[in-house]
Amino acid sequence: QYLMAMRYGVEFTLGRQAAAEDILALRPDQVILATGSRSGQPPWLDDEWAMSGLIPSAREMAADLLERHDVTEGRAVLVDQDHSEMTYAIAQLLAKRFTAVTIVTSRERIGHDVSLINRQGIYQRLHDLGVEILCNVEPVSLAALEDAQLQLRNVYSGATQMIKNVAAVTHASSRIPNNALQAPLEEAGLEVI
């Protein structure tokens, strides 16, 4: 794609973050805004916990874990609301850095948005690594985290259960587009795609 774009005269400026002024200075006819996304804050994660940084997004945790090679005693809990290949690659990384891993999802299975053949491979790899998978549940309270426990609630029956020996909690949540440039560009009269 890069080579084809170059062939058709697309100019790339890499290694810097563009501001609206940078884009406007180029006097474009249209702007294709492809600025990525960030993880949203799941409903079970209140603002205080979110601001503390103690329950990072799976992307944030993966970046941290890639810098380390030690193994942490205890269970990492990955709350899966994303259901993409990225989530399960991070679960595999967690299995290398923690003595136990549990994936929690409110859906009836993991990998809901992944093709069947890929999902089968994901299940095989996760089970080979001893990853526990809990379906139809979601976190209901973070109050017991100080005691290394996470309370879950069944989304159908309301029955609760505890995960014990919790050393870390992370979430793979819906993504929110990084579209801060959209409004200033549209206000300047540009068509933003």
List the model feature ranges, each with a label.
Residues T13-L26, V31-E48, S52-V114, E146, ...:
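Rossmann-like dinucleotide/flavin-binding elements
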Residues Q1-A25, V114-V140:
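N-terminal Rossmann-like dinucleotide/flavin-binding domain of flavoprotein oxidoreductases
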